[in-house]
Amino acid sequence: ESALERRSSSVVMNNVMKKPDLSDPKLRAKLAKGMGRNYYGEPAWPNDLLYMFPVCILGTFAAIVGLAVMQPTPTGEPANPFATPLEILPEWYFFPTFNLLRVIPNKLLGVLSMAAVPAGLITVPFIENVNKFQNPFRRPVATSVFLLGTVVAIWLGIGATLPIDKAISLGFW
């Protein structure tokens, strides 16, 4: 390790570990406006880790327990092992893929269309050659693919709950 590397690492560490200068008038003006917490170098330990995180965790836990007590999950009718239901639906997050397989008549084409989704998503970064840390709204291809995919997934998900003849049109036409 050279002397320059040691000096630059010590400068970085001094800037990171530097205590705030409370006699600085600019800092005092910001503190007076209420911009003090963690803005001027207040350490995360013990303030945030011992006080704020447990409050947030317990608040989230209390909200979940409260919602579970006030609105319990209803249980459906008991399953009859001797009768198959007319329409078997998957869990809600499988509705778009279920509907895609259901409406495409050729099963191989249905499976290939499902495989085309991740393959298409993999190609998006190569199509759009911009800085990956740029604002997402300045990445038109990725934003368009995301919005179109969301609309199609919602459309197919709603269609999965309808009969097969209305699965694509949703009964609009």
UniProtKB/Swiss-Prot annotation:
Record key words, sorted: Chloroplast, Electron transport, Membrane, Photosynthesis, Plastid, Thylakoid, Transit peptide, Transmembrane, Transmembrane helix, Transport
Keyword set includes Iron: no
MF GO annotations: electron transporter, transferring electrons within the cyclic electron transport pathway of photosynthesis activity; ubiquinol-cytochrome-c reductase activity
Top-level taxonomic group: Eukaryota
A biological process term (GO) from this entry: mitochondrial electron transport, ubiquinol to cytochrome c
Topological relation to the membrane, as annotated: Multi-pass membrane protein
Transmembrane segments: 49-69, 108-128, 144-164
Boundaries of the annotated transit peptide in chain numbering: 1-14
GO CC annotations, alphabetized: chloroplast thylakoid membrane; cytochrome b6f complex; mitochondrion
Location of the protein in the cell: Plastid, Chloroplast thylakoid membrane
PROSITE patterns reported in the protein's UniProt record: CYTB_CTER (PS51003)
Assembly information from the UniProt record: The 4 large subunits of the cytochrome b6-f complex are cytochrome b6, subunit IV (17 kDa polypeptide, petD), cytochrome f and the Rieske protein, while the 4 small subunits are petG, petL, petM and petN. The complex functions as a dimer.
Note: This polypeptide is nuclear encoded in Euglena gracilis, but is chloroplast encoded in other plant species.
Similarity comment: Belongs to the cytochrome b family. PetD subfamily.
Function comment: Component of the cytochrome b6-f complex, which mediates electron transfer between photosystem II (PSII) and photosystem I (PSI), cyclic electron flow around PSI, and state transitions.
Protein name per Swiss-Prot or TrEMBL: Cytochrome b6-f complex subunit 4, chloroplastic
Lineage: Eukaryota, Discoba, Euglenozoa, Euglenida, Spirocuta
